[in-house]
Amino acid sequence: MARIAGVDLPRNKYINIALTYIFGIGNSRAKAILAEANVEANRKVSDLNEEEVNRIRTAIENGSSVEGDLRKDVSMHIKRLIEIGSYRGYRHRRSLPVRGQRTHTNARTRKGPRKGTVANKKKATAK
């Protein structure tokens, strides 16, 4: 099993699909990395030799950040938005949708489970 950027790539998948298991690498970026590393996309991870894996590692390191560094960057950007008091930071702080979605009826994923009303609690205890 090839280990790239701290992620074990599945051996039975094609390399262009397996690279998308790394946080920060999507389909188009995986194809660009393989082109830069001069590796064919229609090969399985188990068929790669050590030299090809090293070329892929080098291509990923030369590109932008992935995995832990990228997660850290994203969290730092969110913290910065909260600190400067922007509208987006306020929405992050209140755990509400940030990009303008409606919240009157939807947004249950972001807002969490429904908070019961006092009337509902009285009915539940009366039964």
Swiss-Prot record:
GO biological process: translation
Subunit composition and interactions: Part of the 30S ribosomal subunit. Forms a loose heterodimer with protein S19. Forms two bridges to the 50S subunit in the 70S ribosome.
Record function comment: Located at the top of the head of the 30S subunit, it contacts several helices of the 16S rRNA. In the 70S ribosome it contacts the 23S rRNA (bridge B1a) and protein L5 of the 50S subunit (bridge B1b), connecting the 2 subunits; these bridges are implicated in subunit movement. Contacts the tRNAs in the A and P-sites.
Pfam families to which the protein is assigned, alphabetical: Ribosomal_S13
Iron-sulfur among keywords: no
Signal peptide range in chain numbering: none
InterPro entries registered for this protein in UniProt: Rbsml_uS13_C, Ribosomal_uS13, Ribosomal_uS13-like_H2TH, Ribosomal_uS13_bac-type, Ribosomal_uS13_CS
Keyword Chloroplast (UniProt): no
Similarity comment: Belongs to the universal ribosomal protein uS13 family.
HAMAP family in alphabetical order: Ribosomal_uS13
Domain of life: Bacteria
Cellular component terms (Gene Ontology): cytosol; small ribosomal subunit
Keyword set, alphabetical order: Ribonucleoprotein, Ribosomal protein, RNA-binding, rRNA-binding, tRNA-binding
Start and end residues of each stretch annotated as Disordered: 93-127
PROSITE patterns in the record: RIBOSOMAL_S13_1, RIBOSOMAL_S13_2
Protein name: Small ribosomal subunit protein uS13
GO molecular function terms attached to this record: rRNA binding; structural constituent of ribosome; tRNA binding
NCBIfam families (alphabetical): uS13_bact
